[in-house]
Amino acid sequence: MKIVQETISTKTKKNIAIIISRYNNFINQHLLDGALDILKRIGQINQKNIPIIHVPGAYEIPIIASIISKQKKYNAIIALGTIIKGHTLHYSHISHAVNSGLTNISITNNIPISIGIITANNIEQAIERAGTKLGNKGSEAALTALEMINIINILAQNK
């Protein structure tokens, strides 16, 4: 049995697009900072190879991810945002639509889309997941993107 497993490495040139929601920007900026730190420091990716596309809210992320994925210029996409539960069902609908949309785009277009979108019951939970107590979901998304690029490269070489 062959096991395909890869670490985060800097073997190949990588182009990774980041799509980030402006809604809840005070939280999302921490996600972006975490992602960029990982991509530059660990991934050794040049800033010019990391376009950052700002969209109004999390709901708008999938359409931009779809357009970017079809360009075939990027090895991965990182989606960043924050969806906070309110007193309506809006939170549930948005969360489901965004995650389903990104998953479908990833599978359809064979590009890893790393989801660093916080879904939280309240603003305190969101802040904790953006780098205070519970790690940084932006950093985690960047690490996942780097690892997925390497796994896909290994699978492509072993055809």
Curated annotation (Swiss-Prot):
Its EC number is 2.5.1.78. This is 6,7-dimethyl-8-ribityllumazine synthase. It comes from Buchnera aphidicola subsp. Baizongia pistaciae (strain Bp). Keywords: Riboflavin biosynthesis, Transferase. Pathway: Cofactor biosynthesis; riboflavin biosynthesis; riboflavin from 2-hydroxy-3-oxobutyl phosphate and 5-amino-6-(D-ribitylamino)uracil: step 1/2. The lineage of its organism: Bacteria, Pseudomonadati, Pseudomonadota, Gammaproteobacteria, Enterobacterales. 5-amino-6-(D-ribitylamino)uracil binds at residues 23, 58-60, 82-84, 115. It catalyses: (2S)-2-hydroxy-3-oxobutyl phosphate + 5-amino-6-(D-ribitylamino)uracil = 6,7-dimethyl-8-(1-D-ribityl)lumazine + phosphate + 2 H2O + H(+). The active site is at 90 (proton donor). GO terms for cellular component: cytosol; riboflavin synthase complex. Catalyzes the formation of 6,7-dimethyl-8-ribityllumazine by condensation of 5-amino-6-(D-ribitylamino)uracil with 3,4-dihydroxy-2-butanone 4-phosphate. This is the penultimate step in the biosynthesis of riboflavin.
